[in-house]
Amino acid sequence: MKIAVSGAGSWGTTLAVLLANKGHEVLLWAHRPEFAAALESDRENIRYLKGVRFPENLHVVSSLRDAVISSEMVVTAVPSQALRETVAMFSDCSLDGKIIVNVSKGIELKSGKRMSEVLLEVLPTLHASQVATLSGPSHAEEVSKGQPTTVVASSVSMGTAEIVQEAFHTGMFRVYVNTDIIGVELAGAVKNIIAIAAGITEGVGFGDNAKAAIITRGLAEMSRLCIRLGADPHTVSGLSGIGDLVVTCLSRHSRNRYVGEQIGAGRSLDDIVSQMNMVAEGVLTSKAVFELSRSVGVEMPITQAVYEMLFEHKPVQEAILDLMNREPKKEHY
């Protein structure tokens, strides 16, 4: 199969290499022509994935439109807030028979839409059955080294999900399938916010009890939002829910956890973001999900606390006290 991958960050590059190693012909698109030329010349992504060599059947291109036209499958691996402008580059192309696989984890800030909703809005000829999302606990740093990883491919069409499964599945990259794309995308977005909160507990010096509380109650927030928006409750207990939540909250590779640690240690958000090499999706997603939760009437106190600390400059200790001193509730509501 010929597959285009849009986005040459660590995850896009990792998936491009994985797909090429499986035998697919892969076109990896980089936004800046000079970066694309450097990747093609170096045969590795020194900036984002140093040490991982490109197979011969992986080529780096600077024209996304041409790559899409010539491919059967398109993987979108750009930051969630850049998805709309990226796919607009090929919105006039015929997408008949093509499958679009989103691997970004976020909610669009200006619209409150999930990634598959953005794709369907920007690409008017695309049908929902042509769209899939690949998600789960899958840090690029481990996948690129061939370490065991499990993810889920989700689409409203089981047939499409199974095509994606076949395209990506390897001996060390196990792909499951489901048809709950709503739940998979919402869970993938919310877990980044909860990871920031988990990082904050580290940064202020709290122990494992606090982190476990954040993960567990964060899962409850994720579940409430997913159910309110029509997702399958079982999805939250799967790879895209608890699986990705745990790894993002605990892993040393987690950019969102890192942001939280630094916030907890007293650094400003602007200072943290300005010194990061890659995007922490949970930052802007916290604002998008907070606004979404209010619009649909779902209580998400941890998400609200993260939003207030990041965007309203609420002191960390004050936010923690407010969380702990909320009115007592039933565990499940």
Swiss-Prot record:
Pfam families in the cross-refs: NAD_Gly3P_dh_C, NAD_Gly3P_dh_N
NADP listed as a keyword: yes
Domain of life: Bacteria
Pathway: Membrane lipid metabolism; glycerophospholipid metabolism
GO biological process, one term: glycerol-3-phosphate catabolic process
GO molecular function ontology, one term from the record: glycerol-3-phosphate dehydrogenase [NAD(P)+] activity
InterPro entries attached to this UniProt entry: 6-PGluconate_DH-like_C_sf, 6PGD_dom2, G3P_DH_NAD-dep, G3P_DH_NAD-dep_C, G3P_DH_NAD-dep_N, NAD(P)-bd_dom_sf
EC numbers, comma separated: 1.1.1.94
Localization (cell): Cytoplasm
Annotated sn-glycerol 3-phosphate binding sites: K105, G136, S138, K191, D244, S254, R255, N256
Principal location listed in the UniProt entry: cytoplasm
Protein name: Glycerol-3-phosphate dehydrogenase [NAD(P)+]
Organism (species): Chlorobium phaeobacteroides (strain DSM 266 / SMG 266 / 2430)
Organism classification: Bacteria, Pseudomonadati, Chlorobiota, Chlorobiia, Chlorobiales
Gene for this chain: gpsA
